[in-house]
Structure formats: structure tokens, C-alpha cells
Amino acid sequence: VSHLLVNQIISHHTGLHDFGDVENILKERLLSKEINEGDISINKPLLFQEFIDSPFSKSKVEWKHFHHLSRMLFSCLVDADRLDTERFMDVESWRKRGNSATLADLLPQLEAYMQKLQSNAADTKVNRIRQQVKEQCSRTSSSEKGFYSLTVPTGGGKTLSSLLWAMKHAVSHSMNRIIIAIPYTSIIVQTAGLLKEIFGEENVLEHHSNFDPDDIKDEENREKAKLATENWDYPIIVTTNVQLFESMFSNKTSDCRKLHNMANSILVLDEVQMLPTGFLRPIVDALKAYQEMFGVSVLFTTASQPVLSGLIEGTNPKADFKGIEHIKEIIPEEFALHDQLRRVKLSIDDTGKTYDEIAAKVSEYNKVLCIVNTRKDAKELYDRLPNDGVKLHLSRMMCPAHLHDC
């Protein structure tokens, strides 16, 4: 424990050190200066008493998860140090932090929004299924903390229903925030836009490479968002898988600072099948650690759930590892959503085609989506299409602003 706490203290300006380096670093620092007796007084109050008395400290820490505990304590110290300095040096910025709505405050707004959608929706099969999914999410939301999955095909209302489950689950367990991690920035922009429409931009933080807080028109919200990217002190955060998991394994002060605000929160991993298989073992271990030690609930959402429980096979037998022990599916099998929402019939033609042949085939339809393997293929095919009507080229050769305009 002494090494654990010492490492936080000597690292909070430089980045978290490896455990093996702590003793040598400490010796060097102690030998380089004379220590005043007042510096080591034992009459000062125990600053960690609140943490020691908290539920998190009562959980058993496996050795393989010890580095997550180290980072969590490091995060607490770094953020407290930065906020204390900010309160002294820049009190105006300090006053702009926090004061956000709680999830309990925001839940009625979501329920009202979903009720309005339902009232205005036509009585169709798809809308009845969406309502069924919503009601099931609402019914199961008060279940105990843990791992959950929501498997809903495209068009089944997964985005709003998963958010309803997460918010009601959070309110049931007095949890602090919802963190939504998505693999693609294009989906993040759409999701964040919807959430801001429901809750207001002052309650939804976007944190990804394509978002510039300077684009926020309201000055107060703009400054709050800039500050909140440092420590995620918002009720709802929408971010990338990269931002989330790099922070969990980083030793940098800037990355680790936000980690303590992930404790007692809900992680919603959208399109979970896109988790990189090469990093699946440390990701799964991290999620298990955060659930067991820091009171986190995890919701996996997708149309096609990957295998994350039981024995997960690696690239060779030695790389096999134990997944999550129990993931509770929210939607029961008898709902048969995949059968009810099946809207696509696959017809596979494995013969080779030239660009001109594909262009001719595409031109036969009034509305058509053509997906190809590479950006070069997309450009070649686009150039061969006739100019009558509307044709759009979408690829990462375009800048994000132009993609958004399309």
C-alpha cells in the first residue's frame, strides 16, 4: 500500500511511474534535499478516509487488476491537484465547472421525448417492435449492477432504448454519469446531435478528434465543454473506443485525469463487435476490473453480439482467456427481432466485374447504395456514373466537414 500511495504522489506532475522504479526515484529525491520535520507530521487529517470508507475499497483486488486501482487513485490526485490550482490561479474557470444536471433531472426529458415520438408515430409493425423494445428496457433497468447486452437489429430503436435503460439503471443505483463509446466518429456525431436535441448541449459532452468546442455558439457552454474534456465532469459523455480504452491503460496525467469520473458510472459500448480482436483480452480484463472494483455497469449494444463470455479463443491455445462470467441479455429470445425486422435478402454473385459493368448495373436503379472496398474504387466508380440525377461520393478522401454536409 505504501508503494501504491507513494507512486501517486511522486508521479502526479510527470506521469505514473512503473512500480519497479518507485523505490529508486524516492531514494534520489530524499537524498537530494533535507526534509523538514513538519513535512512528515502525522498530526494532519487522513485525506484518504473517505475513499477507505467507500464501497470501492471493500472489494477484493486481484493482482492483475492492481494497475487499474493505481491509475484510479492517480486520477483522483491529479484532478484534485489541477482543480485546486485552478481555483487559486483562475477562479473564473473553476466556477464554470460542474453545476450540470443530474441523470435523475434528465430522465423526464428523455421519457417525454420518447412519448412524443410514440404519439406521432404511425401504427406500423416496426413502430410496435420499437415500443416493445423500449418497454423491455424500462422493465429490466432496475436490475443489479453488472454486464448487460442489448441485441436489436437496425431499425429497432436501439439508440433511444439503450439510453432509456442506462438512465433508469443509473437513477436506480444513484450512479453519476453515462459514457457512450462508439467506434466511428460519423456515428458519434449523429448520436451526440440527437442527445443534445433531447437534453441540451450543456449536458452532453462530445470528446473525439472531429469535434471542436469552438463550434459551440453559446459562450458559457463552449467554455464548459472545453474544461470538461479534461476530466469528463458531465452527466453524458459521447466518445470513441480509442479515447476510452487508451485512457484506461495510459500513464499520462492528461489521459488518467478523467478516470475517477468513470467510477460508479454506466459504460455503453455501441457496435461492440468492432472492438479490436488484437486487444480484446486487456479490454475485457479492464471492463471486469471496473465493474468489480469501481461500481461500473456495462451495456453492450449491437445488432450482432460478439462472444465475450466463457473461454475466448486467441490466436493459439496459450492465448485463450476467460471472458466475462455472465452477461445478461435484455431482449428475450422469444421476441425474435431478427426475424421480424429482416429487411434485406442477400444475393451473392461472386463473378468478377469491371468498373463499367458495375456502373451500368447501378444506373439501372432509381435509388441505390454501392459499397466498395477502397477509396480508389469509390472514385473510379463515381467517375463512370452518368451525371443525370443525384450522385454522391462518400469516402475518407473527403474532409469531415464535407462528409457531414452530404
Task: Tell where the protein language model's regions lie, with residue ranges.
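Conserved helicase motor
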Residues: 206-220, 373-376, 391-406
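Walker A/P-loop
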Residues: 144-167
